[in-house]
């Protein structure tokens, strides 16, 4: 018997002071009828203040309906940052790609371009260390070896966005800073686990360039070391600072986590962050800008498509 869909509902006050709803769709693990394709984009970055030109790459997913000749159709772009120990190839495997295909094959979600990035400098080096601890050179500020400027937020804006969005049919008119800001309504950033930490960090540093955010299964470190203690005031200030500085810019944060056996510190932060005066909790983008969904999942990057099935029903609307 085929597994059935189910809705996981927590009323206000049960976990956080707001209700949470997560739609579990087992079809994400099915066989898609409509399939997209992946393309690799190679680029260089010089943003790390070390005098070096680092070669890097990302993987771009083009949905089944993407037509390079149709220049009139402009696609929204969702960036994905993987978790600790992983790499940008995580969803390019046969099984991984199927789960991405199934998000859009459902017919319930507007197809978008997806970009799979990495904060690691070179995923082909020190592979065993990366896959074991994840502690290899990286630009997101979470490399234990130190000595690297935490400038991945610059790499995304200065190098990745133009490399991807000027190649495909997107809302980016040219590579200027003004054009990147002007097209923010068509751009989102998301990530799982350490990639969620990176998503909060992108919101903090690149708010003028991204309208939508989908952090999955991890809290913000508020710019502090991963294992440091942080107060609710520090967390709230870190997240809301760019929003207050650019109060004219609309946004939506769709955060997700597993419960009760995933990243508990994220759920703890969600008990107070949505109460900040810059937020309106709910799923209606016309009047809300923050939502938190709780699945029953364990912790692994491969579950991200199930979270996208929820968040992409709200983001880009």
Where are the regions a protein language model picked out?
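Non-catalytic cap/lid and distal C-terminal segments of serine-dependent acyl enzymes
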Residues: 1-317
């Amino acid at each position: 018997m085929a597994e059935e869909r189910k809705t996981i509902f927590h009323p206000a006050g049960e976990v956080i002071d707001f209700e949470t709803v997560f739609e579990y769709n087992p079809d994400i693990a099915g066989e898609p009828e409509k399939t997209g394709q992946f393309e690799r984009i190679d680029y260089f970055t010089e943003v790390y203040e070390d005098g070096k030109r680092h070669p890097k790459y990302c993987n771009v997913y083009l949905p089944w309906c993407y037509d390079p000749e149709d220049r009139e159709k402009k696609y929204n772009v969702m960036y994905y940052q993987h978790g600790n120990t992983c790499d940008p190839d995580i969803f390019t495997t046969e099984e991984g790609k199927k789960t991405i295909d199934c998000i859009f094959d459902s017919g319930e979600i507007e197809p978008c371009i997806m970009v799979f990035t990495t904060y690691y400098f070179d995923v082909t080096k020190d592979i065993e260390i990366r896959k074991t601890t994840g502690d290899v050179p990286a630009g997101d500020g979470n490399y234990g070896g130190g000595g690297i400027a935490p400038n991945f937020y610059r790499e995304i804006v200065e190098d990745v966005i133009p490399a991807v969005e000027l190649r495909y049919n997107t809302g980016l008119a040219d590579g200027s800073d003004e054009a990147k800001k002007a097209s923010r309504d068509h751009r989102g950033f998301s990530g799982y686990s350490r990639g969620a930490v990176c998503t909060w960090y992108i919101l903090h540093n690149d708010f003028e360039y991204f309208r939508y955010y989908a952090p999955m299964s991890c809290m913000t470190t508020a710019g502090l070391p991963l294992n440091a203690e942080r107060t609710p005031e520090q967390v709230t200030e870190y997240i809301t600072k760019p929003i207050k500085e650019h109060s004219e810019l609309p946004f939506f944060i769709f955060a997700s986590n597993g419960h009760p056996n995933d990243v508990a510190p994220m759920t703890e932060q969600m008990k107070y962050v949505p109460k900040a005066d810059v937020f309106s909790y709910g799923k209606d983008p016309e009047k809300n800008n923050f939502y938190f969904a709780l699945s029953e999942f364990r912790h692994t990057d491969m579950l991200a498509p199930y979270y996208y099935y929820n968040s992409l029903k709200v983001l880009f609307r």
